[in-house]
Swiss-Prot record:
Reaction equations catalysed: cytidine(34) in elongator tRNA(Met) + acetate + ATP = N(4)-acetylcytidine(34) in elongator tRNA(Met) + AMP + diphosphate
A biological process term (GO) from this entry: tRNA modification
The organism's taxonomic lineage, starting at the top: Bacteria, Thermotogati, Thermotogota, Thermotogae, Thermotogales
Similarity remark: Belongs to the TmcAL family.
Class of the enzyme per the UniProt entry, highest EC level: ligase
Protein name stated in the entry: tRNA(Met) cytidine acetate ligase
Organism: Thermosipho melanesiensis (strain DSM 12029 / CIP 104789 / BI429)
Compartments where located: Cytoplasm
């Protein structure tokens, strides 16, 4: 049995995503396809444009058999944390045979060489990284130049290591190697617009450009499959989107104005004076864009700053994130499945090293059952399971507060919304 895993955000699901999925299936010829998908907040440090259940529905309509949620504590981390959370989830399910990810270079040897080198020589690389960071470079640039020196590579190497998907790909492979996972990995050449392109250009435009068009109320139908377009328009018609960082502006600024520097001491990602820059900037910022601009330096990128805001908002304690990045994902929360996927879920439930959560209301009962089960080798830490799960619930409760339609801003989305049971179209 071949089971393909894809790691996605689908924010929103667009033509490039469909191409990636179709190509992945051609490479692997899987019996089933699993998606590990970010929940209501995404890796760039932004809310998803529509909620996780609607995005899971679109995924099922386009060829995914089962959608699991990537816990918020990983979805809102940098490439390393994001990748580790997703790969540990796939690995602990024990049924996934292959993973396919997009890459600008599609150079498997390059990606593997860099991943192995980073994994085998962490101290030497860390020292080079610190030297570059002291020059005032952003983390991505510091990593790029440190890797160039570390591997003694040429200028072409620098161009490759700048690519968003190549960087993420390196982290995926690094996690697979670190876990000694048996999962096979494959690369697909990324086509169309670049990850960060902000304007619609072709059939394969970036998710960023499509979100910008949606927020500006511009046409976007050409750039997404019809199945995606219909669900997006339905959610918008009910006032359950679009949700954007701009919607949250006053809430975020108010939250930050209530903070003191000491409040950030225990929060993950507040290092190297970021807390001081937050406190200084919020005193003179009337708009979120002003705040981001004032905090930004070569070292602190916009994405890192946005993620740090949500780390503070969701109270991401350093000790728990570090613990999460050591032990990995503690459960597999189902967002949706097809009839075909239901057969796979039966197999997963018998073999998984982490509990499968289908009904969030019963998560405590599920945990208790796992902790008292002596017949199976579970990889679950009680304290971490509870903490990771609670952060998902908090994230949903905050997310729904920013639906355009006030009547839709209900508490307890995770407990009210049933699992999506869809069919491929």
């Amino acid at each position: 049995m071949k089971v393909l895993g894809v790691i996605v955000e689908y924010n929103p699901f667009h033509n490039g995503h469909l191409y990636h999925l179709q190509q992945a299936k051609k490479i692997v010829s899987p019996d089933y396809v699993i998606a590990i998908m970010s929940g209501n907040f995404c890796q760039r440090g932004e809310p998803a444009i529509i909620n996780k259940f609607a995005r899971a529905e679109i995924a099922l309509k386009n060829g995914i058999d089962v959608v699991f949620e990537l816990p918020t504590v990983y979805a809102l981390q940098d490439a390393g944390g994001f990748a580790f959370g997703a790969i540990t989830l796939l690995d602990k399910l024990t049924v996934v045979t292959d993973v396919v990810f997009g890459s600008e270079s599609a150079d498997k040897n390059f990606i593997t060489t860099v991943a192995k080198t980073l994994l085998e020589n962490p101290d030497k690389f860390d020292n080079l990284l610190k030297i570059e960071l002291k020059k005032g470079l952003s983390f991505p640039n510091a990593r790029k130049f440190a890797l160039k020196k570390f591997l003694n590579e040429n200028e072409d190497f620098l161009k490759m290591i700048e690519n968003s998907n190549d960087i993420l790909g390196i982290e995926y492979v690094k996690s697979i190697l670190k876990l000694k996972s048996k999962i096979n990995y494959h690369l697909i050449k990324r086509i169309g617009a670049k990850y960060n392109d902000t304007e619609l250009e072709s059939k394969y435009s970036s998710a960023t450009a499509i979100r910008n068009a949606i927020v500006r109320n511009n046409p976007f139908e050409t750039y997404v499959p019809q199945t995606s377009y219909k669900v997006l328009k339905r959610e918008f018609s009910y006032g359950r989107g679009p949700v954007s960082l701009e919607n949250m502006e006053q809430f975020i600024l108010t939250f930050l104005r209530l903070k003191h520097r000491k409040d950030f001491e225990s929060i993950y990602s507040f290092t190297e004076g970021l807390d001081q820059r937050f406190i200084k900037a919020i005193k003179t910022s009337k708009k979120l864009s002003d705040f981001l601009e004032k905090v930004k330096t070569k070292r602190f990128t916009y994405s890192r700053i946005r993620r740090a805001i949500f780390h503070a908002l969701f109270d991401f304690k350093k000790e728990y994130i570090e613990f999460s990045n050591k032990l990995g994902t503690q459960y597999a929360r189902i967002l949706g499945f097809t009839k075909k996927g239901q057969k796979l879920l039966s197999k997963i439930k018998k073999a998984s090293k982490i509990p499968i959560i289908s009904n969030p209301s019963l998560h405590e009962k599920v945990l208790k059952k796992v902790l008292t089960d002596k017949d199976r080798k579970w990889e679950v830490n009680k304290k971490l399971f509870i903490w990771q799960f609670e952060k998902d619930i908090v994230a949903s409760n905050i997310y729904t507060m920013f639906y355009p339609q006030k009547n839709e801003r209900k508490y307890g989305l995770d407990f009210r919304k049933p699992i999506i049971e869809g069919e491929n179209e």
